[in-house]
Amino acid sequence: MRLSRFLLPTLKETPSEAEIVSHRLMLRAGMIRQHASGIYNWLPLGLRVLRKIEQVVREEQDATGAQEILMPTIQSADLWRESGRYDDYGKEMLRIVDRHERDMLYGPTHEEVATDVFRKNVKSYRALPQNLYQIQWKFRDEVRPRFGVMRGREFLMKDNYSFDLTYEGARHSYNKMFVAYLRTFARLGLKAIPMAADTGPIGGKLSHEFIILADTGESAVFCHRDLLDKPAPENVDYDSDLQPLVDSWTSLYAATDEMHRPDHGVPEGDLVSARGIEVGHIFHFGTKYSAPMGATVTAPDGSSQAVFMGSYGIGVSRLVAGIIEASHDDNGIIWPDGVAPFDIGVINLKVGDAATDGVCADLYGRLRAAGKDVLFDDTDDRAGAKFATMDLIGLPWQVIAGPKGVAKGMVELKERATGERHELSIDSALAKLLG
């Protein structure tokens, strides 16, 4: 993509309404613009990041055997009355009456709809287990939306719902999501710590939040220091017994403020007390929804049995902000490789110079042909402005070409994360970027 044709409305000054780093940088980098309180337009740069996060989430869900579906954002209130949750959300739920005087709502979550999908389409235990997921927009009418997309009213979420015949099967489904979440967040360049958590209005007796540590986090969190360096699992066999792997994480103390115990037993020097941002939440809630809503299957003995369920959420749009909170410096965003809106920025320092134009066009073409996402700064801005823009938007690599270097057959390669710059031959720079 040529920058001269790309909608990138960057800002030099920090907007007064932005309270935290991620909100400031998302506005300054031209990723989002507010439409209404807690509701945002996603501009091209922001949407590219959102889509890349979606893809990582999707790949890790698919690896577990979960199946993607898409459920409506507007839901029937009757389903929520069936489950008994219609009044639990209070004013946080946006309620709608259609032209036929039917009560509807903009879904804050999808347990009821997912249960309805299941009960209408699965009748026998032979079709179990099932795990259905979607990536869909949701709405919760927060009293005080703040912090940009970190705590907006409209947000993009990956949510899935598991259905099993037995408690043991449901625990295995829960463990699969536990492990998949560890892998997902690691691929996004985040250290997310699973913490025992309150189940809230979702319900159930087993729940973990996945928390990234950040000074701007809204929640107080506590964990054993060893969790900070514990690597995410690789080469997972999701059909195997995952309980030992899950136990290796949950045996180390970690809890949100609501679940924190004074008798935690962690030596004082090993207990980390910090602020955290929730980026994922998983629940096992048995038959809380299936029993009242009649989501049953015919069991092996011929009886009708309510299925055991779990639900699992990742805040996809919130993750964009979370990654920025965890990875930035004074100059702007530092995107991890897997989610950067572009892999490489090519900077032409002298637009109109035939030799420099030719080298930049060649670099741009060869990098794109190799499958790289490239943003080519072909504008006639001054060099300082070009560097500031590239640092602000945080692409992992910058290739800088100017007349002096080009005359020697050289370009400059800059790594955003470290700030290191090296002068290399054009072929060496390409080899480094494509290696």
Curated annotation (Swiss-Prot):
Q: Where is the signal peptide?
A: none
Please provide the Gene Ontology terms (biological process) for this protein.
prolyl-tRNA aminoacylation
Location within or outside the cell:
Cytoplasm
Q: What is its EC number?
A: 6.1.1.15
| PROSITE patterns from the UniProt entry | AA_TRNA_LIGASE_II
Keyword terms of this UniProt record: Aminoacyl-tRNA synthetase, ATP-binding, Cytoplasm, Ligase, Nucleotide-binding, Protein biosynthesis
User: What is the catalytic activity of this protein?
Assistant: tRNA(Pro) + L-proline + ATP = L-prolyl-tRNA(Pro) + AMP + diphosphate
Concerning InterPro entries, the annotation shows: aa-tRNA-synt_IIb, aa-tRNA-synth_II, aa-tRNA-synth_II/BPL/LPL, Anticodon-bd, Anticodon-bd_dom_sf, Pro-tRNA-ligase_IIa, Pro-tRNA-synth_IIa_bac-type, Pro-tRNA_synthetase
Q: Name one GO cellular component term.
A: cytosol
One example of the protein's molecular function in GO is: ATP binding
The keyword Transmembrane helix appears for this protein: no
List the HAMAP family: Pro_tRNA_synth_type2
Q: What does this protein do?
A: Catalyzes the attachment of proline to tRNA(Pro) in a two-step reaction: proline is first activated by ATP to form Pro-AMP and then transferred to the acceptor end of tRNA(Pro).
User: Assembly and interactions?
Assistant: Homodimer.
Q: By its UniProt entry, which NCBIfam families does this protein fall under?
A: PRK12325.1 (NF008979), proS_fam_II (TIGR00409)
Family, according to the entry, reads as follows: Belongs to the class-II aminoacyl-tRNA synthetase family. ProS type 2 subfamily.
- Its recorded name reads Proline--tRNA ligase
Species of provenance: Rhodospirillum rubrum (strain ATCC 11170 / ATH 1.1.1 / DSM 467 / LMG 4362 / NCIMB 8255 / S1)
What's the source species' lineage? Bacteria, Pseudomonadati, Pseudomonadota, Alphaproteobacteria, Rhodospirillales
